[in-house]
A protein has these predicted regions:
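Short acidic-aromatic low-complexity motifs
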Residues: 18-22
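C-terminal catalytic core of tyrosine-transesterase DNA break-rejoin enzymes
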Residues: 124
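Vicinal oxygen chelate
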Residues: 1-15, 25-121, 131-145
Length: 145
């Protein structure tokens, strides 16, 4: 009986749409430290129909918009969601992303819930939020909710 989800996948996996998926793959691997798992060429061998990246074993799928599906660059509207990624060294990750040209939307900052975080946008307008869990916090320590 096959595994569901397949091995190497999670039950929830972001699927991101980029006008230039090949450029997005290059940026996400160089700026944010993702690893490319696979890439399928589009019709006639052009562009990227589907690709899969991962960060520390967590997959992200991406492709080129088409039909009813559109990415933030094609709509002219900010991404209505963001991808949240835990990293091992938030400050080094921030420096790498900034050096690679990511638009930093929120500088690294300690949060009340025990994470140190920063926000960024990639060159095609996708929003990303990176975090490092730096201290354990109880619900009482975090305050009223």
């Amino acid at each position: 009986m096959p595994h569901n989800p397949p091995e190497g996948y999670t039950r929830i996996t972001p699927y991101l749409l980029y006008e230039d998926a090949a450029a997005a793959i290059d940026f996400l691997t160089s700026a944010f430290g993702f690893t490319e798992r696979m890439r399928m060429a589009g019709e006639g061998g052009q562009g990227v129909a589907h690709a899969e990246l991962e960060y520390d074993g967590s997959p992200v799928m991406l492709g080129t918009p088409g039909g009813e599906f559109a990415g933030p660059a094609s709509t002219g509207v900010d991404s209505p969601a963001f991808v949240h990624v835990y990293v091992d060294d938030i400050d080094a990750h921030h420096a790498r992303a900034k050096e690679a040209g990511a638009e930093i939307t929120r500088e690294p900052e300690d949060q009340f819930y025990g994470d140190r975080t920063y926000g960024a946008k990639d060159p095609q307008g996708m929003s990303w939020y990176f975090a490092q869990h730096v201290r354990e916090m109880s619900a009482e320590e975090m305050g009223p909710g």
